[in-house]
Amino acid sequence: MSSRRKPEWLKMRPPSGERFTDIKETLRDNDLHTVCEEASCPNMGECWSGRDGPGTATFMLMGDRCSRGCNFCDVKTGGMEPLDPDEPANVAESVAEIGLDYVVLTSVDRDDLDDQGAGHFARTIREIKERDPSILVEVLIPDFQGEKSLVQKIIDAGPDVIAHNIETVARRQVPVRDRRAGYEQSLSVLEYVTRESDIYTKTSIMLGVGEYDHEVYQTLGDLREAGVDVVTLGQYLQPSRSHLDVADYVHPQKFETWQRVAESEFGFLYCASGPMVRSSYKAGELFVDAVLREGKSVQEARRNARRAASE
């Protein structure tokens, strides 16, 4: 583990509460995985406890083992297993049982499969939408090795938001990400979704992995040029001694600056930026929900999301 002492602003309350327990039991009963648990997300207690609504969880599809080995990620690598054909229906059933009106789906990378899992991902989206079309579905997808026909399968399934994380600036892609990933490849996925659909696009950047400010600025510009609508920025935290060291703990005020730059200068519809923000951060979901479901203006949706996140 990094020898750097974590600053006070990174300390979180442990997860608890009846809502948290109910969601955990439902997931266990249906043999489902969440990225919240597998990636040791620090916001799990906040999201699952439903502080600002019915609660949310990010379902991780296609198993709990990834075909790639990114140096920041706590998900296990290798030992890939066959897909569970019942998983799409089980996820949809759990969404209904928990009572979610906004669900996030992500997955491990499955480079071992012919379609890299795109068909399985699309079936899960359709299962949820067929049961209740009013549920908003956000998907955080792999890069599918840049194969646009596989990205198109996701688009055709009709999610409300498609996210794909660029993770870090161009110079730090290696050693941060697996060598099969890449800056330009991730940009091309996001650009394709923007060009071929009206679906909202979203991405995430980790800070504290050795990047410089001018590189973050450049990355924001590249993302906006690709048509990305929503961006989140958060602090990288080292999951274990075997993972990438933390280069720097970025002060909350710097995150506030990046939020202003992203929205006011580059014109992102929304930017959630803070030390504990993650790609599926709830404030971002609240923004999208307010725009898509309630028809609020971008400015009003921003205010509502930030007010809820600060309460």
From Swiss-Prot:
GO molecular function annotations of the record: 4 iron, 4 sulfur cluster binding; lipoate synthase activity; metal ion binding
Cofactor(s), by name: [4Fe-4S] cluster
SMART domains named in the record: Elp3
PROSITE patterns: RADICAL_SAM
Annotated source species: Halobacterium salinarum (strain ATCC 700922 / JCM 11081 / NRC-1)
UniProt pathway annotation: Protein modification; protein lipoylation via endogenous pathway; protein N(6)-(lipoyl)lysine from octanoyl-[acyl-carrier-protein]: step 2/2
EC code(s) of this entry: 2.8.1.8
Keywords noted in UniProt: 4Fe-4S, Cytoplasm, Iron, Iron-sulfur, Metal-binding, S-adenosyl-L-methionine, Transferase
Protein location: Cytoplasm
Taxonomic superkingdom: Archaea
Name of the encoding gene: lipA
Entries under HAMAP family matching the protein: Lipoyl_synth (MF_00206)
GO cellular component: cytoplasm
Official protein name in the record: Lipoyl synthase
CDD domains xrefs: Radical_SAM
Similarity-based family: Belongs to the radical SAM superfamily. Lipoyl synthase family.
Positions annotated to bind [4Fe-4S] cluster 2: C66, C70, C73
Reaction equations catalysed: [[Fe-S] cluster scaffold protein carrying a second [4Fe-4S](2+) cluster] + N(6)-octanoyl-L-lysyl-[protein] + 2 oxidized [2Fe-2S]-[ferredoxin] + 2 S-adenosyl-L-methionine + 4 H(+) = [[Fe-S] cluster scaffold protein] + N(6)-[(R)-dihydrolipoyl]-L-lysyl-[protein] + 4 Fe(3+) + 2 hydrogen sulfide + 2 5'-deoxyadenosine + 2 L-methionine + 2 reduced [2Fe-2S]-[ferredoxin]
Coiled-coil stretches noted in the UniProt entry, renumbered to this chain: none
Domain Radical SAM core: 51-269
Cofactor annotation remark: Binds 2 [4Fe-4S] clusters per subunit. One cluster is coordinated with 3 cysteines and an exchangeable S-adenosyl-L-methionine.
